[in-house]
Amino acid sequence: MLILALDTSGKMASCALLQDGVVLDLLQQDSQMDHSRLMLPLCEQLLQKHGLTFADVDVYAAVVGPGSFTGVRIGTAAVKGFSWAQDKPCAGVSSLQAMACGSTENGVLCCSLKARPVESFYALFQREDGFLIRLTEDKVGKDEEMEAAAERHGATVFLRDCQNAAGAAKAAWMQARSGKLQNCHEILPAYLRLSQAERLRKERMEQQ
């Protein structure tokens, strides 16, 4: 099974190819959040490097959040388009799970992304002998809440802002093996919190 995975949830745009559980290659570029312009050429470059086309891909995967709202929308829309055009299944992957899958360390992993100055997106996982188990759902909260959760679960490995498409491809492979792939209509962004515009609108409505 050949998986093409995209990650546009942060400043780095990346794409990766995975064949039967093994990452073949990873391309990434600091796009300064210009993912809409760079993502398609980056995918084409990766496929051409290995003598492949979009038609050769069996599963398309995207990091669907949490992370940059705009970036998440771009990656999700791209994979929806690839999946629809090629009539292939797809996988929506958590950025935090991608981070965990990209690590090889055993123990309890606390994976986090900066959300706001004093808030983080976070989730905890446990890996033993190559098996990854999710301990918590993806959450957003104050850094103190994340630290308390990490202490409660006995976290020994701390990963922050280091997700990429290679980890996303591994997470998609896990979904494929467990029969949890999606179609192009089912994959959706997972923001976890309101955008700034939505937050301001909500505050204005509450003040009226």
Task: Tell what function each PLM region has.
Residues 35-50, 96:
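Short, well-ordered amphipathic alpha-helical segments that serve as non-catalytic structural scaffolds
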Residues 38-41, 77, 81, 98, ...:
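Short amphipathic alpha-helical face segments that pack within enzyme cores
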